[in-house]
Amino acid sequence: MGASKAPDAPRVLVIDDDDDLRTLVVRVVKQAGYGVDSAADGQAGLDRLAERTYDVIVCDVRMPGMDGVTFYREVERRDPAAARRVVFMTTHVRSEECRDFLWGVHAPVLNKLFTLDEFRSTLAQIVGPRR
């Protein structure tokens, strides 16, 4: 899924296996003035990253197939600068390993009960506010 925005508009990649949430987040990103693409899992996200550069990557932690942790580690291996632009979404962290991972990468983490203002603020922290 793509969006037509001004060529200089920051680009956001949204990765989440929940179709409804992914669609909602894509809509919010577009309304905030960003260009946006989406993917339903980590592997599809990596495929998108091979095609273009993104200013922000919003990624679910728990997904079937390639989860967010594995996705992040692969992005970090391929392009450490891109890994610093990842924002994670999660309902809650269940395993100690996942908690340790999120704590260790120092990436922003949005609870999936986030408000639209929290989401927009997190994007703006990474790429700056949109006019």
Residue ranges and their predicted role:
Residues 1-11, 115-131:
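Non-catalytic signal-transmission and effector/linker regions of two-component phosphorelay proteins
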Residues 112:
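A Lys-centered signature of the CheY-like receiver
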Residues 33-40, 48:
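Short hydrophobic/Thr-rich beta-strand motif most characteristic of the beta2 strand and flanking loop
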Residues 89-90:
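Hydrophobic/aromatic residues positioned on beta-strands within the core alpha/beta folds
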Residues 63:
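Receiver (REC) domain active-site loop signature in two-component systems and cognate sites
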Residues 60:
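Active-site residues of response regulator receiver
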Residues 23-31:
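Charged docking surfaces used in two-component/phosphorelay signaling
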